Structures are given as C-alpha cells and as structure tokens.
From Swiss-Prot:
The gene is elaA. Gene3D superfamilies: 3.40.630.30. One of its GO terms (molecular function) is N-acetyltransferase activity. Belongs to the UPF0039 (ElaA) family. Disulfide bonds: none annotated. The lineage of its organism: Bacteria, Pseudomonadati, Pseudomonadota, Gammaproteobacteria, Enterobacterales. Residues 7-151 form the N-acetyltransferase domain. This is Protein ElaA. Pfam families: Acetyltransf_10. It comes from the Bacteria. CDD domains: NAT_SF. It comes from Escherichia coli (strain K12).
Length: 153
C-alpha cells in the first residue's frame, strides 16, 4: 500500500526534500543518462506543491506541481516519477490521479499543462490531456506538450 502526501513546498521536511531530489536524480539523470541541472529553483517557491508516494518508508512515486504567479498561465505538472521497482504496478495511474486531484482542489478553474515524454502520450491522454505541440527534443529525449482543460464537477 502506498501512502500519499500532497505538500506545499513550505511543508517539506529536509528528509522529504532529500528523498525527492534523490529519486529525481536516480531516474532522470542516472537511469535516463541525461545529465542536467535538476535543481532549477522552482521546488521551493510560490504556491508550488509536491505529491509524494511512500512505500515502507521509501519514496517510490513523485510529481511536482508549479503554480505561476501569472493567473493567465496554466498549472504545470512535471518531474513525474515512479521508481523502477514499482513500474508496471499501476502506481503511475495512482500518482496522476492524486496529482490531478490536488490541481482540482487548489486551482479548480485552471487548465493543466505538462511536457510529456512522447512515449507516454497515450498514458496522459487517458487522463484527459491532449497534445498541444509537435514532438520536440528536451535533453535528448522526445517530448510533447499536453494540456487538460478545466473539468467541471
């Protein structure tokens, strides 16, 4: 069973921040062989939030939600990760459901954007995202911009 947390950046403990940065580095930098500066200055600003999934005290799933100060900009989901050990167990679906619940709870009138790795386009489409850009390369990996309009309850 995965325990989920939805935390404003100001609620993150040092150990939670360390765990999320460690998981992001393990997947995006090491596993995907993509050397880039992951710590981009957006983790601890504004109304940004972090979705963390824990199993046996280990961080196994994570997503970051960026809320721009510009009210005309969409909410942006990024850094979506499931640890290698739990892939194929539908943890990604749980993570996206929790992440979108957070977006709807905190910003019910805001569309949502994400830059998806292109091979995950169908996964994100299953959550109501549609492509809004052509495929582009980011850090040597094909990506596609996708958006989800406001869903009225």
């Amino acid at each position: 069973m995965i325990e989920w947390q939805d935390l404003h950046h100001s609620e993150l403990s040092v150990s939670q921040l360390y765990a999320l940065l460690q998981l992001r580095c393990a997947v995006f930098v090491v596993e995907q062989n993509c050397p880039y500066q992951d710590i981009d200055g957006d983790d601890l600003t504004g109304d940004n939030r972090h979705i963390l999934g824990w199993k046996n005290d280990e961080l196994v799933a994570y997503a970051r939600i960026l809320k721009s100060d510009d009210d005309l900009e969409p909410v942006v989901i990024g850094r979506v990760i499931v640890s290698e050990a739990l892939r194929g167990e539908k943890v990604g679906q749980q993570l996206m459901s929790k992440t979108l619940e957070t977006c709807t709870h905190h910003w019910p009138d805001k569309p949502v954007y994400l830059g998806a790795q292109a091979h995950l386009q169908n996964f994100y489409q299953s959550f109501g995202f549609i492509p809004v850009t052509e495929v582009y390369e980011e850090d040597g990996i094909p990506h596609i911009g996708m958006a989800r309009e406001v869903i009225q309850a």
